[in-house]
Amino acid sequence: MTRLLDASLVLLPMLSTLVGAAPATVSARADTCATKGKPSGKVLQGYWENWDGAKNGVHPPFGWTPIQNPAIPQHGYNVINAAFPVILPDGTVKWEDGMDRDVKVATPAEMCEAKAAGATILMSIGGATAAVDLSQTAVADKFISTIVPILKKYNFDGIDIDIESGLTGSGNINQLSTSQSNLIRIIDGVLAQMPSNFGLTMAPETAYVTGGSVVYGSIWGSYLPIIKKYADNGRLWWLNMQYYNGDMYGCSGDSYKAGTVEGFIAQTDCLNKGLVVQGTTIRVPYDKQAPGLPAQQGAGGGYMSPSLVGQALDHYGGKLKGLMTWSINWDGSKGWTFGDNVKGRL
């Protein structure tokens, strides 16, 4: 042991000389970078999976991929939703390698690298399996206090609200339920502690939005007061309503099958015109809409072929803010046909 230590002491000056002789070949990646703010142009927004969807057999051969993979911007994606943090029953948010099976998160430096290459990166909250208990204020407060340090450390540019359970309406759109109040508490609590250009998007399923044209209460239309608040006060960057995994609705309670151009247009026009529920109008103009579609067959019910996606987009002639898709990894597993089709049409 003593000999090894002596030898290392002799080698240290030599190593220092070698390292100092070629500084141009050694560079440390920055692990902090500024919040980017809302993209001024069109967006193609995709979910980045922090787990391995090839290893678990969902969408081989393209599983986990680095968030800074140059293929992502090459195929048109300029907004990335990093999915999903683990949320413990008490509201504690976790974002770290191994927080769930086969999960690996991007480092702060890798986040900065992706952002330098053009990406705006949001943390997506919720999803089908990462629920937040919205019935308790203490849980909401714990959520805020634990997510804000993560958002700052990892250089996120915003949050995406993708909560798919636990949010219900009171039956009176002018009276918030406990779960609606606590979701607003979470959003306000996060935004208050982040830079003023920190972003907010939402990706509700159709029942939570245009489903309110059928009836308001329970899950039906339960996102509407939240959407209205942040659309009206200017903090909502845009809405990514999921045009899949269920029927779609127009302003008059009319119903359309997912995966149809007719349904795409009916929902989009309804929000642009303004959905009136119990005398309250909720309006999301075209330039604050980036509807969500499955990237590939199997990614979600209501898949639209590239031809149908093109028809839906071309109908609006560039009026929409963009499109969202589930997911980047799914698209990569089938030759990036979604991104390649959309990027030239926005």
Positions of predicted regions on the chain:
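Short mixed-charge
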Residues: 273-283
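Short, solvent-exposed mixed-charge patches
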Residues: 345-346
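Residues that scaffold, gate, or flank divalent-cation-dependent active/transport sites
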Residues: 327
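Chitinase-like catalytic core of GlcNAc-active glycosidases
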Residues: 24-271, 286-307, 320, 333-342
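Fungal secretory targeting signals
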Residues: 1-27
